[in-house]
Amino acid sequence: EYVIRVQRGPLPEKSWHIYKRYNDFVTLHNAFQTSGLPLPLPPKKLLGNMDREFIAERRVALQNYLNIVLMNPILASSLSVKRFLDPDNYSTPFHELALQHVSMALRSEANYEVVKPIPEIGWRLRKHYFLVKNRVNPQDELLLAWVEHGPDKYMDEKELQASFKTIGSLRHPYIQSIEFLSCNEVGGFVTRGLNNAGSLRDLICSAKPKLQFMKKYTNPKQCKPLPVSDVALFGHQILEALMFLHEKGLPFGHLHSGNIVIENHKVKLLDIENGVLGLPSYYRPYFVQHRKIQTLEAVDVYCFGHVLFEMIFGHPLHESVCDNLSPNCPSLLRSVLESIISSEACKKGLPTIGALLSHPFFNNSSYDLSHSERPHFKYSTHTKEALRLAWQKTESRLKEEQKMKQEQLHKQQQQQVLANGKSPERSESPNSTSTATSAGTVTPPTVPLEFPAAPPLPPPVSTSDVGAHVERAALLGSICNFNKAKLRPAVTPVSTHNGDDGRLS
C-alpha cells in the first residue's frame, strides 16, 4: 500500500494523505485510455512483487507516473484524477445534480425543453452541457451550459439576477448572443445557438465538437496552424470585443481557444458570464505566478497572447512563458508575442488592449472589419456598481494568492540556501518553481508544479568537544543499527491544474 500526500495550493497545511494500492493506479490508468496518450504506468508483476528492491523501484515509477499525469492540465482536471486524489470532495454525482437544477429552472419556461445531455465536452468538472430545443423553433439546435458558482462570486442573488439580465441583452458583432439564461443561489445556465463547426480549438485540432474533451485535445492526431492573415484578422476582432467589454465595465478574464467560435470568418466570444458567476480562469495556474498580472485587463491580454500562440503554431503553449519562439514566426507577430508571453514582459508589465489594437500587426487597413450589428450593452447604476465591486474583489484575491505564492517560493529558496550552501537563482518565471510547464504539457496548457517546503533543519550541534563526541557516537550507533526491513513504500507531491498536489510516501 502506498501513502500519497496531497496538497492543495501553496500552503503545506492544506494537505492530507490517501492510501492506494497498485490496482488503484491501474484503474486510474484505464480511465485515460480514451485520450490515446502514452503514459508510463509501471507493468504488473505477479512473482516477486513483495521484494523490497522491486517495491522501491515501483514507488519511483509510480511517482513519475503521477508527475506526468498532474503536469497535463486535461488529465489533471479530469474527474478520475480528482476522485483519485480527493475522494471525499469529488464523490458527488455532479451531472445528476446539474440535470436536476436545469430541469427545475426550465419548468417555468414553456418554450424550452432538454433533449439530451452532451457529456464532458468541456474542461470544467462542474460545468455540464445539454442539447435543448425551443418549442417555437424545434429545428434549431441550442446548447445549454450549467455551472456552479466559483470562488470569485461576490454578488448577492438580487445583484446576480440583475447582472445576468443585463448580460442577456448584450449585443456585439464579435460576441456570441445569448438565447436564454438564468441563475440561482447554486449556479447558472446560459443557452446559445449550437455552432456545428465547434470552437477555435476544435478548428485547430480538426476535432468533432461533441466528442469528450479528453479524447479531442489530450493527444490530437492532426493539428494545423491558421494562416498569418487569419491570425491578424481574428486577433484584431478579439481585441475589439475585449476593448468593448472593458469600456462597459465587464472584463472577460476567460479568453482561450475553447471560448471562441468562428462564423463567416468572424470570431464570436463565448462565456462572457463566467466572471459574474465567479469562475476561475483556464490560464489562472499561469498568470497567478506573475505579480505584474494583477488587473483583469492584464489577465485578458495575457490570455490573448496564449490564443495568438495557439493560432499561429497549431498547438497550445506548454509553458507559462515563451522565450524561444520559432524562427518561422513573422517578425510583427513575434514582437506582439514577446510583449505578452516572454519572461521579460511578465516581469515588467504587459501592454494594454488599446496599445495592441494600434500595433502594426493588427492595424492593417486591408482587413474587412465591417459589420452590420451595432454594439449594445446598457445597465443600471446599481448593477454597474455591483460589477465594479465584484471585479475589485476578484483582483484583490488574485493579488493575495500571488503574494502567498511568492512568499512560499521565497521560503523554499531560503531553505535551499541553508540546505545546499548556495543561493539558487531567483526568478518570477514558473520554471523556477517547477520541473515542468504550467498550464499544459504534452498537449494543452500545463499546471505549475509546486513542491512542498523542505523539511526543517536539525537543531545546531553543540560546539563543545564533549558534545561533538557524544553526538558522533550516537550517529554511528544509529547507522550501525539501521534496519532496512522497517522501511515502508512511498511516493512524493506534484500540483494539479486547480492546485491539488499528490506525492507518494
Where are each of the predicted segments found?
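Short beta-strand micro-motifs within the conserved protein kinase catalytic domain, predominantly
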Residues: 177-188
